[in-house]
Every structure is written in C-alpha cells, then in structure tokens.
Amino acid sequence: MHTRAIYPGTFDPITNGHADLIERAAKLFKHVIIGIAANPSKQPRFTLEERVELVNRVTAHLDNVEVVGFSGLLVDFAKEQKASVLVRGLRAVSDFEYEFQLANMNRRLSPDLESVFLTPAEENSFISSTLVKEVALHGGDVSQFVHSEVATALAAKLKLAKP
C-alpha cells in the first residue's frame, strides 16, 4: 500500500487546478507532500519561500498535506521523503507525451517510484500558472482561477514589478 505521495511542481502560482488535484490526492494517500521545485531553468515570478507560503495557505485545511521546497532531482527528493508515488496532473492530451517521457525517466532512475496521473475537474482543465500570470499581467481578473490570497499576492507582485 502506497501511503506517501509527492505532487511536484513549480506552483508559480498555485492555481485552482493544482488545488483540485491536491484535494483528490489527499483522499487517495495517507500523506501528500507538495514538492515545490526551485527550478533554475525557469524564472518564477514568486520566490521559493513565497510559493511555499501560498501553497501552505491554500492547503491549510488538509491535515495530511505537507508543503516542502526542494532543489535537485525529483527522484532524490522522493527518496528523502520516503515517498513511493509521484502524483502528476494531465490537463490535455498535449501533456501526455511529456509526462510519459518523464515517468519513464523517473522509473529508470528510481524503479520503485510509481507515477499516478490525475486529470483536473473540467472547469479547471485549461488553467495553467502561465496563463494566470499572463491574464493578471494585462489587468484581467484571475479570481476565478486562483484562491483569493493568491490573486491578492499576484496583484501585489505585478504592481511592484511595474516600472
């Protein structure tokens, strides 16, 4: 029985789609670790600490969810956390090929680590952090796509970034 799962991502910022998958993973596994990646190849709008804090706020009502920032290989982080499952989201068919390659690479690096794929609720299937930031950057209302605290933090972050 798999009891510890990791849902990894950049979460820049966490969206309602992410939150939906976290809620469902929390029902499937005894303990869910949200692994927030410090990915040097991406240039996140929020710092790692800010992303950890936002995800903590959004998931505070879930007793079996823990939020941890990490850097390095995901398989090494999973081993450190004693997790045997990776939870990944599939929004569309276009996500499948990349996720399939990633799952196979992770399996090659850590044969005992399983990947489990969840699809978001239909109303969240098109939401991505990138699209949310783009809408917010152009002054659009993102409150239907993210938690209210995330919308507030994103508005403040963008206001500070304007010249």
UniProtKB/Swiss-Prot annotation:
Top-rank EC class of the record's enzyme: transferase
Any one of the GO CC terms: cytoplasm
A GO BP entry: coenzyme A biosynthetic process
Binding site for ATP: 10-11, 18, 89-91, 99, 124-130
NAD keyword on record: no
Gene Ontology molecular-function annotations: ATP binding; pantetheine-phosphate adenylyltransferase activity
EC number of this enzyme: 2.7.7.3
Pathway(s) annotated for this protein in UniProt: Cofactor biosynthesis; coenzyme A biosynthesis; CoA from (R)-pantothenate: step 4/5
Similarity annotation: Belongs to the bacterial CoaD family.
Protein name (record): Phosphopantetheine adenylyltransferase
Source organism of the structure: Shewanella baltica (strain OS195)
Lineage of the organism: Bacteria, Pseudomonadati, Pseudomonadota, Gammaproteobacteria, Alteromonadales
